[in-house]
């Protein structure tokens, strides 16, 4: 495997998790979505974002809603700077319990030491990630239920499939896919707990990675949201590409951030994070990485847009 292909391999698989398209982030707080009979106040917050964070929220866009979520992210692995430009998610509500999703992220890699044996000789290069198509399906919603029902988490199923956009990516990751169960407890009006668990596949791996996240979301005001989250991957059948030996690989990571609604249909966000432990690097042992990013969510269209 060439050095360039090795670097692409790291960017698109188990080296940092924030590159997985399906891991695009959960909102730090949930907003009410109006139905056709709901009286709408001018300043009511309608959007429900899946960013920032790496777990995904269980709330589904209602029928007729169209939402765009995009952002910028910068990360550092020893010897390599990574800039995600952009990370973009489109969400389309097709039913009150089903939304369709399309996502793309492109990564600009910049070498600290182009002459290093662990890096390509290029000072920088762009890696297009797979185009991801998916659906989120609401399985259970406790909204409006009794107190006992509210202790049952709102639950959704997220399904994704990724298709490579370039021949270089296709050689090492022809097709990827994921299936995640998304759970959320609304403990109080200002506090919720979300947790996800799922399996993520790629063509090159005989066994899927297991992904798990746990996040706590705070809403101190109607406009401001805060979150802290742990997200982790576990691979019981990883392979060292140099020795061809199998081993168990896992990443334990932490991120935190905030959101601010500047308009009922526009939300800004900022976040940062790092890995607490990486069991093994495919290059030369455990390596830490850190990242930060910011973005915007825009509810482009909803059924009442024309009436406002």
Annotate the PLM regions.
Residues 10-19:
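Hydrophobic h-region of N-terminal signal peptides that target proteins for export
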């Amino acid at each position: 495997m060439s050095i360039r292909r090795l670097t692409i391999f790291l960017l698109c698989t188990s080296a940092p998790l924030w590159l997985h398209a399906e891991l695009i982030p959960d909102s730090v707080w949930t907003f009410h979505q109006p139905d056709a009979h709901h009286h709408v106040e001018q300043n009511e917050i309608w959007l429900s974002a899946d960013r920032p964070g790496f777990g995904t929220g269980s709330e589904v866009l209602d029928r007729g809603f169209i939402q765009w979520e995009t952002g910028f992210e910068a990360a550092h692995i020893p010897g390599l700077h990574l800039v995600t430009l952009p990370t973009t998610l489109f969400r389309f509500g097709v039913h009150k319990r089903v939304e369709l999703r399309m996502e793309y992220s492109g990564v600009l890699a910049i070498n600290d030491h182009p002459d290093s044996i662990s890096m390509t000789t290029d000072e920088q290069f762009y890696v297009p990630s797979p185009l991801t198509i998916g659906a989120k399906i609401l399985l259970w919603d406790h909204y409006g239920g009794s107190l006992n029902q509210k202790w049952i988490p709102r639950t959704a199923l997220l399904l994704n499939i990724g298709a490579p956009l370039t021949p270089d990516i296709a050689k090492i990751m022809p097709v990827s896919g994921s299936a995640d169960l998304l759970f959320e407890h609304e403990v109080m009006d200002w506090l919720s707990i979300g947790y996800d668990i799922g399996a993520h596949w790629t063509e090159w791996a005989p066994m899927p990675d297991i992904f798990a996240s746990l996040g706590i979301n705070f809403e101190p005001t109607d406009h401001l949201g805060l979150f802290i989250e742990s997200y982790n991957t576990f691979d019981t059948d990883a392979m060292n590409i140099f020795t061809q030996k199998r081993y168990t690989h896992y990443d334990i990571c932490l991120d935190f951030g905030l959101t601010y609604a500047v308009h009922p249909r526009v939300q800004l966000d900022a976040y940062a994070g790092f890995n607490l432990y990486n069991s093994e690097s495919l290059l030369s042992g455990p390596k830490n990485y850190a990242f930060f990013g910011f973005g915007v969510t825009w509810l482009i269209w909803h059924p009442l847009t024309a009436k406002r």
